[in-house]
Each structure stands twice: as structure tokens, then as C-alpha cells.
Amino acid sequence: MDVYPDSALLLLEQIPHPEKLRGKQRADYVLLLTQARDKNYLDSMQSDSLIKLAVDYYKNGGDNVKAGKALFYYGKVMDLQGNDTLAMQAYLNALAKLEKTEEYKLQGLAYEYIGILNADRKLHKDALDNYQSSVYCFQKAADTLGVIYAYRDIARIYYVEQKYDSVYNY
């Protein structure tokens, strides 16, 4: 999925009659399909009906990784729809599910998106804290690109606050 998201999407779309899938298979399918659409930057991710199936299925189950991932993508869909409040709640719920897992990259992404929402609300201190948490998670995941993006986000906050000396550190 991370390396060849276009191939993953193609394979998922070739599954005959996905509407006949039930239970875990259906939840896994819609979670993977939403993830593939996101990684391919498709506008079709703006519909929340599919990912909501996965959120509802995993919310009471024992798979915190899939529950966290479903909540994260639900947050992204809500963000695309302009519903910042539901997006924030979904990201926070995703972090709550993921906190006892080793899904550090996904945790880092959740912190980053929370930071973006906070920055949009002019809550710069909160956004800075979120971005710093994101750096920590990306470092634990050995995700160099994630660390770079998080540092960029930190620098932007310092720039907006006109703390130019701090901008140069990042």
C-alpha cells in the first residue's frame, strides 16, 4: 500500500461484488479502499459512508491498530468535508486507540493533522506541541520524511509568531 498505492487501488477495485462482503471482511475492504484512495489523492475520499462502516465495526473490537487507522481516515474525510470539529475528534480518538501500539508513523500523522487543525484555529502553542509530538513519533518510526515535514510545520509556526531565530533552527 505504501510503495504501490495505485496497484493496491486497482486490485481492490477488481474485487467482484464488494457489497456482498460482511463483517470483518467488509470492514477490512473499506478501510483498505479508503487508504488506497487517500494515497492516490482521489476526491472520492470525500464520502464518509464507506469509512464509517470500518469505524463502526472496529470501535468495540480488540484490534486497536485497525480501529485507530479507521478513525484516522474518518478524520481525513471529515477534514475534506470541512467539518473540523469531527475531524479533530476522530484524530484524538485515533490517538487514544493507537497509544498502546507501535504504529508510530500513524501516531505521527495523527499529531500532524491535529497540529494543522490547531494552526488553522490560530492555536499556535497547541499546534507546536502537536508537531513536536509528531517529530517524536516519526523518529520512533524511523520515518525521515515524516520528521522533515514535522520540522517544516514547526518552522512555519515560529515564522507566523515572528520568532525568526527559531525558524532557522528548523
Q: PLM features: residue spans?
A:
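A "functional boundary" signal
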Residues: 1-170
